[in-house]
Regions:
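Cytosolic, long alpha-helical scaffolding segments
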Residues: 1-209
Length: 209
């Protein structure tokens, strides 16, 4: 199979990927502050919502640029998949925060804090992997970052299962169970989407490293 000796340069795509990745890092940091302190709840949820809107704008710009660019830095399908996966991470962080406010759940417990910690770590790895994408010499580093993202996603699965078991065991209030089940699902899904990002990045690195 013919392989290009270098990745064609369209630097604006990399700028947009990096902006999107940094955006989800910022959102994960606000989510962690929200979960850890349970202070300034509405302003923090609104801050995440504004970051989600910013993420949508970045996504739309990538897609528009994709339609009008003849030579892209890597496969168009991979660009679209990466863009969607990054946007999905943001959407689930926003959904988790929004549900906490909407349902008036009160101060989050241990499992929500553990999931927020994992989301922080996973989005940080995603951002670093996206930064590596711009530099051909660093493409091989993406593989190690993807392994770590996969490990974090597995850790989130463990916490999620423990959270669900405790939720059904400890509460007789079904409304409480339903609310927190949805929140936990959104938080765990954010790590799933980080893994989707990792899978796309790993594929790009395999093609071009």
């Amino acid at each position: 199979m013919f392989k290009l000796p270098f990745m064609p340069r369209e630097e604006k795509f990399f700028d947009l990927f990096e902006s999107s990745a940094h955006n989800i890092v910022e959102a994960s940091q606000v989510l962690k502050q929200l979960v850890d302190t349970w202070e300034n709840v509405e302003p923090r949820v609104e801050e995440i919502r504004e970051l989600e809107h910013k993420g949508d704008s970045i996504t739309h710009e990538v897609i528009a640029r994709l339609h009008r660019t003849f030579v892209t830095p890597f496969d168009r399908e991979d660009i679209a998949s990466l863009t969607k996966s990054l946007d999905d991470v943001m959407d689930f962080i926003d959904a988790a925060a929004g549900a906490m406010l909407l349902y008036k759940v009160g101060s989050p417990g241990k499992r929500a804090k553990e999931l927020a910690d994992i989301i922080i770590q996973a989005t940080a790895e995603v951002e670093q992997a996206v930064l590596d994408l711009r530099h051909r010499a660093k493409l091989k580093q993406i593989f190690d970052r993807c392994v770590e993202i996969n490990r974090l996603e597995n850790a989130a699965d463990v916490v999620y299962r423990a959270a669900m078991a405790e939720l059904f065991e400890d509460s007789t209030d079904m409304a409480h169970v339903i609310k927190w089940r949805e929140i936990y699902e959104h938080m765990e899904s954010a790590t799933d989407r980080c893994e989707d990002v990792a899978n796309v990045l790993e594929g790009v690195a395999l093609k071009h490293a």
